[in-house]
């Protein structure tokens, strides 16, 4: 059973203090995995800014001081979202450091300690393929981690499976929406963190043993809709 297969597995979750990351971490804990979280928010987990090389090194060293192996890595930490009008060079670099460089470097630090059959999950976004105005830093980071996924999958062939998940609208407060916010979604509702956690659990299980290098979009079908003015889409209101 999927409830038993994660017992005593060593699981790492970045950005695991809140939202999707916390839900994923909690679901692994519920299944008796040994979970290590890093987040810049204060708490009982390892506290640090993963944009900093030395923080990632210290975090990896702490995990490896207690275990000689790692089974699962979930790169979830949220990059900064700012657009081209307001985002500075430094802020854009920071977003890429959190969203792309940190996942790459954390895997690099731990790759020699991955068990055979390890699983790496990178949390991207449906914004890796579609955009709203003024979201360049976030969108670039999410596109980067989606591409990093298939590169790592090939490099780590035979050692670990690497997949990414692209969430759509996920309400981390589990708000139940009615009206257009819900009905615009082909699935009929807005998503919640469990929708993502369930997929992460599946991808880390043996049931997904033939899946690697893939990106799975969990967005209630929003990115599959054709939207044309006046034709099952939006209407211009003057």
Q: What annotation goes with each model-predicted range?
A:
Residues 83-96, 181:
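Substrate-binding pocket helix/loop in short-chain dehydrogenase/reductase
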Residues 107, 141, 149:
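Active-site helix of classical SDR
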Residues 76-81, 221:
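Conserved NAD(P)H cofactor-binding loop of Rossmann-fold oxidoreductase domains
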Residues 212-238:
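Short C-terminal tail/terminal secondary-structure segment
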Residues 164, 179-211, 218-220:
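C-terminal helical subdomain
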Residues 112, 154-158, 209:
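Alpha-helical segment proximal to the catalytic Tyr-Lys
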Residues 3-35:
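Canonical Rossmann dinucleotide-binding motif of NAD(H)/NADP(H)-dependent dehydrogenases/reductases
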């Amino acid at each position: 059973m999927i409830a038993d297969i994660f017992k005593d597995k060593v699981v790492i979750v970045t950005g695991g203090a809140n939202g999707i990351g916390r839900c994923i971490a909690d679901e692994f804990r519920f299944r008796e995995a040994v979970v290590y979280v890093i987040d810049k928010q204060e708490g009982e987990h390892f506290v640090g800014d993963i944009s900093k090389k030395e923080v990632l090194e210290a975090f990896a060293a702490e995990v490896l001081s207690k275990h000689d192996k790692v089974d699962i890595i979930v790169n979830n930490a949220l990059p900064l979202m700012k657009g081209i009008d307001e985002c500075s060079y430094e802020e854009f670099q920071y977003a890429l450091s959190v969203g792309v460089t940190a996942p790459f470097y954390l895997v690099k630090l731990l790759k020699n300690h991955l068990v055979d059959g390890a699983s790496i999950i990178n949390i991207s976004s449906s914004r890796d393929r579609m955009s709203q105005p003024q979201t360049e830093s976030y969108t670039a980071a999410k596109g980067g981690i989606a591409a990093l996924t298939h590169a790592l999958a090939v490099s780590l062939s035979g050692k670990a499976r690497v997949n990414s998940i692209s969430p759509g609208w996920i309400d981390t407060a589990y708000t139940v929406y009615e009206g257009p916010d819900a009905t615009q979604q082909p699935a009929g509702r807005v998503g919640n963190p469990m929708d993502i956690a369930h997929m992460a659990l599946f991808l880390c299980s043996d049931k997904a043993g033939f899946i690697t290098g893939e990106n799975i979009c969990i967005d209630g079908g929003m990115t599959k809709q054709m939207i044309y003015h006046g034709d099952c889409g939006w209407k211009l209101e003057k």
